[in-house]
């Protein structure tokens, strides 16, 4: 009877993953995938933003989105009736720039710019406003968002950021990278928009201190103001920037009474 010999076949032993020996290939491929997605998101972020800024100017944006997103149920704010504007030599240019200021019925103090060059201000904000300067600062702030391309550019930037965080599941974390990135972008845009609001007052030769009510009230009653402040810089810092380098501190404020202004709100 022949002796049976044991033959060792050259079969590679599969190394099972353990806590001390993780699946190295899986970890490596996951890291590569994450890096690839982040790079693609970064490229898409800059590409979309560059295309929009170079090929879609403000007037083109108004033509494309102005009528589509127009709210027929809202009312136009007759900016041309502001005493501080109609009596100013360059007021007509401001009236033209603000021909899309709409009044909404929302019961909260708020204002925002939207696609198509629209600016919306709530009836509640107008009811509580004390001076024309206050309203003009806010309108100038939102006008700056439009001309700085913050609305349409912000939309383009948010798409790749949202897609990458959704795919990677990072949007479910307590420290959501998407929210952190978009909040930083928003705060930077708000700082520049505040400069635009202040510049509007200075161009009209007005006292910037007359526009401080909104910030002062917000500082003492945070709960009342949500959307306009949510992703904005520190309120006290914004107030400080509004008041400093004021060339017209002695100029009296222009009183604003919403009840007297009702007749100046007309249907679009």
Regions found by a protein language model. Name each.
Residues 2-268:
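A Zn2+-metalloprotease active-site environment signal
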């Amino acid at each position: 009877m022949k002796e049976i010999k044991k033959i060792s076949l050259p079969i590679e032993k599969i190394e099972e993953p353990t806590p001390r020996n993780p699946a190295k290939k899986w970890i490596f491929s996951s890291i590569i995938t994450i890096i690839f997605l982040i790079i693609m998101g970064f490229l898409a972020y800059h590409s979309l933003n560059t295309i929009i800024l170079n090929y879609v100017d403000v007037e083109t944006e108004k033509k494309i989105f102005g009528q589509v997103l127009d709210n027929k149920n809202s009312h136009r704010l007759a900016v041309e009736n502001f005493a501080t504007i109609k009596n100013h030599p360059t007021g007509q240019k401001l009236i033209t720039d603000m021909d899309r200021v709409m009044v909404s019925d929302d019961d909260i103090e708020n204002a925002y710019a939207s696609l198509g060059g629209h600016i919306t201000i709530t009836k509640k904000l107008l009811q509580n406003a004390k001076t024309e300067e206050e309203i003009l600062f806010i309108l100038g702030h939102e006008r700056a968002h439009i001309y700085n391309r913050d609305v349409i550019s912000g939309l383009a930037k948010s798409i790749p950021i949202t897609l990458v965080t959704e795919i990677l599941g990072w949007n479910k974390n307590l420290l959501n990278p998407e929210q952190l990135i978009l909040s930083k972008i928003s705060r930077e845009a708000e700082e520049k928009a505040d400069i635009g609001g202040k510049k509007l007052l200075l161009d009209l030769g007005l006292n910037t201190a007359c526009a401080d009510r909104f910030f002062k009230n917000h500082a003492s009653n945070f709960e009342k103001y949500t959307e306009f402040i949510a992703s904005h810089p520190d309120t006290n810092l914004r107030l400080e920037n509004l008041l400093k380098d004021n060339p017209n501190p002695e100029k009296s404020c222009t009183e604003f009474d919403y009840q007297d202004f009702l007749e100046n709100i007309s249907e679009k």
